[in-house]
Regions:
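S-adenosylmethionine-dependent methyltransferases
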Residues: 1-246
């Protein structure tokens, strides 16, 4: 029996059943994401720091990232057992509904779900439970990139977080603080114009960047593409996602 969705009294909730790789995920989300724009709390936060609630939307790039996590033979989820990582940890930045993080947890990785919006974290945690992710693999944290949490992570994942150029440097500062020396970062993006400016900034900040293309065919047969950016510290040479970075 499916659990009662969180925050039922705030706004109507919709259940999405998503076929991703070998799994069908149950993802709860607000039925009308646009209605959150009229929320007085959101309006107040927008006046403070231009915040907008993008988290209730199921973005195609998050589905493509989740599928790549679950299905790619080069995914850290598939290769961690071949490496010398002791107690590997994954972090999802801007987790929204938690789709990519749930995919990593389905592969056995402990995942810390983080978002700027506390409601997003509630949904991500609830969705993880609905998909039978063991509680010991799930941690949730409210996090502002300007004030990263303590801790280091071997694998950082994110989708659709590059839509504002003004946040690129802040995001990279957070990644630099949170990533282990030999860690890897996967960021998927729906090929937005703003995302094209991110790799040069990342290189300036001491990262190597590889770009590959993810493809997705939705239930309606519509094809979508997304860029997968793989980041890696420059002080380590390695092969990531099938691409040798030099």
């Amino acid at each position: 029996m499916t659990q009662r969705p969180p925050l039922q009294s705030r706004y109507p909730i919709r259940l999405h059943r998503l076929d991703i790789g070998p799994h069908q995920l149950e993802i709860f989300a607000p039925a009308d994401p646009d209605s959150l724009l009229d929320d007085p709390t959101v309006e107040a936060r927008y006046k403070k720091d231009n915040y907008l609630p993008y988290w209730p939307v199921i973005w195609p790039s998050s589905l493509m990232l989740a599928e790549h996590i679950l299905c790619s033979p080069d995914s850290p989820a598939a290769t961690a057992s071949k490496q010398t990582i002791v107690q590997p940890r994954a972090l999802e930045l801007g987790c929204g509904l938690g789709i990519a993080g749930i995919a990593a947890a389905l592969c056995g990785w402990p995942v810390t779900f983080t978002d700027y919006d506390p409601e997003a974290i509630d949904f991500a945690a609830f969705n993880a439970g609905c998909n039978k992710i063991p509680s010991h693999l799930v941690e949730t944290r409210h996090m502002d990139w300007r004030q990263p949490m303590d801790g280091k992570f071997d694998w950082i994942i994110a989708s659709d977080v590059l839509y504002e150029r003004r946040l690129h440097g802040i995001l990279l500062d957070a990644i630099d603080q949170l990533l282990t020396p030999n860690g890897v970062v996967w960021i998927s993006d729906q090929q937005r114009n703003s995302a094209a400016d991110f790799p040069p900034v990342a290189v300036q900040r001491g990262f190597r960047v590889a770009n590959s293309v993810l493809k997705w065919t939705g239930p309606s047969g519509v094809n979508s593409d997304a860029d997968l950016l793989t980041l890696h510290r420059t002080n380590r040479s390695a092969t990531l996602s099938g691409v040798t970075i030099t």
